[in-house]
């Protein structure tokens, strides 16, 4: 059975990645990219609509954004919250619940999938500022949280 995970690293420039996973197999990275604010909703809406039309289950994983003393000082801080709101609205527009959004800590994603691990597993996005790589990390973390074991990391 096929399932999709759409993973998002929200911000002024956002990373978005779409994965497909068949039972018993490793996730397949279908595409990844980095998007500015005026481009952000389009790939999300397209991925959600295609999943609905094909009748494939889709989960959404997104980097959690927490406001603290440091983020208050950061001029870019509202962008992440705004992008998460847009993501939730895209979900609602196709009949999903905003509560179905799987928010994940950035530290968890980076700890489990640092750059060398992404390269070893061949989930690498070339170019950009690293936002697509962060989205890829969140997609893979979602699969780990739902039972996938990245055994490729154990190989020498």
Question: Where are the model-predicted features located?
Answer:
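Phosphate- and other anionic-substrate recognition elements at nucleic-acid/protein interfaces
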Residues: 1-156
């Amino acid at each position: 059975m096929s399932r999709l995970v759409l993973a998002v690293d929200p911000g002024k420039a956002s990373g978005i990645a779409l994965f497909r996973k068949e039972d018993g197999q490793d996730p397949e990275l279908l595409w990844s990219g980095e998007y500015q604010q005026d481009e952000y909703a389009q790939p999300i809406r397209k991925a959600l609509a295609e999943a609905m039309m094909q009748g494939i289950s889709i989960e959404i994983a997104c980097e959690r954004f927490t406001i603290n003393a440091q983020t208050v000082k950061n001029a870019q801080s509202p962008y992440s919250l705004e992008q998460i709101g847009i993501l939730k609205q895209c979900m609602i527009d196709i009949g999903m619940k905003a509560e179905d959004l799987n928010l994940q800590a950035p530290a968890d994603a980076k700890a489990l999938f640092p750059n060398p691990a992404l390269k070893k597993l061949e989930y690498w996005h070339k170019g950009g500022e690293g936002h697509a790589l962060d989205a890829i990390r969140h997609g893979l973390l979602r699969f780990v949280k739902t039972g996938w074991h990245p055994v490729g990391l154990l190989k020498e």
